[in-house]
Amino acid sequence: MEILASKRVAGTIMLHLEDGSKKFLVHSIDDKLEFALAELSEGKTGLANILNFLKEIVHIDVSKISWMELTNTHINQENVPLFVFETEQKNQREELGEGYIWEEPGQMRSVLGTYEVEGVPFF
């Protein structure tokens, strides 16, 4: 599969905890939090790319997530689709791929603040 030059797709997941609170999937890199970012492969849709990334890299059971929203964000002047999913804590493994963590809503707001998001996702 050929990678399209510098085209990416972003994603996050809202995790519904058993106590009723929520956490969000983020990538922690160099003391910075960001969305999960996947390179777009030729012949695959943005949705297929992010689902494959979440499954293979982040170790999410993608059969147990629901698509909530699709919006657009800009990362370094690049137009990047942002997929937002949700899932229940009981449906996911505790351990995520390297660098991926579940963060509190306040931290997610700070992640959103670092991007130019068209139509802030509703969650």
Model-predicted regions and their roles:
Residues 5, 55, 84-87:
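Short, structured secondary-structure boundary patches
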Residues 37-69:
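The catalytic Nudix box helix
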Residues 2-3, 28-32, 45-52, 121-122:
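Generic detector of short, locally flexible boundary/turn motifs and exposed helical patches
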Residues 1-36:
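N-terminal strand-loop-strand
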Residues 29-38, 42, 76-123:
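Nudix hydrolase/Nudix homology domain
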Residues 3-6, 12-14, 45-48, 61-65, ...:
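A short linear-motif detector with a strong N-terminal bias
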